[in-house]
């Protein structure tokens, strides 16, 4: 059951000034939220990543390659995706540039 909402954030590199960040666009998607598993956490730590949460989207087509998302007022970097049938899991870590 999809019981939560995240906002996938995409960048538009064509819309910016010379010294400005690219403009961003947010898209709302429904998901299920679960914690990152211990094995996943330990494997990621070996690569200097700190997975915190896994968002499961019921339809993999809803994910369009975004690198960041917003949930609960915080920005997260998407560090891993895993397709499982029609679903896709997005493993994320908290962004340091909030």
In which residue ranges do the predicted regions lie?
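Short, conserved turn/kink motifs that form compact alpha/beta structural patches or helix kinks used as
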Residues: 21-98
